Amino acid sequence: MDRFNCILNDTEYIYYLKRNKKFEKDRKFCKHNLKHFLDVARIAQLINLEESLGFNKEIIYTTAILHDIGKSLQYENGTPHEISSWEISKEILHNYRYNEEEIEIIKQGILGHRDKKSENFAQLMYRADKLSRLCISCKSIDECNWGDEKKNFKIYY
């Protein structure tokens, strides 16, 4: 988990984390912050262990902290955040010596985390991302654009 922890302290990573916070300052719906990222990581790792999927813990955690890192660019210029998150992540991953195989897995997780039909690692990230949202206690649930079929009214992890 050394590389993962280095990313958490990376100047560029912190810059985009702060940008997300700035753009979501007045947002009343789910935020795209470190708490969300770590919720996704922990849920994905629990699913990984429960279902014996065999994914590497550091790859799961790394993907989770990067999957929404470009959300501010979606607010700013309309770029889908999975695309901007991947663009930001590429250089960061190379800086901390992730190998090409690891980078490809992380890429699939970031780019596929919004696609219900995604497979393998991307499907794990999709599931964890959705399960991380606490709709059951949300004060803005009635205004949320998620349909009831998507909202979490139960806690699984």
Curated annotation (Swiss-Prot):
SUPFAM superfamilies: HD-domain/PDEase-like (SSF109604)
Positions of the HD domain: 33-134
Lineage: Bacteria, Bacillati, Bacillota, Clostridia, Eubacteriales
A Pfam family: HD
Name of this protein: Uncharacterized protein Cbei_0205
InterPro entries: HD/PDEase_dom (IPR003607), HD_domain (IPR006674), HDIG_dom (IPR006675)
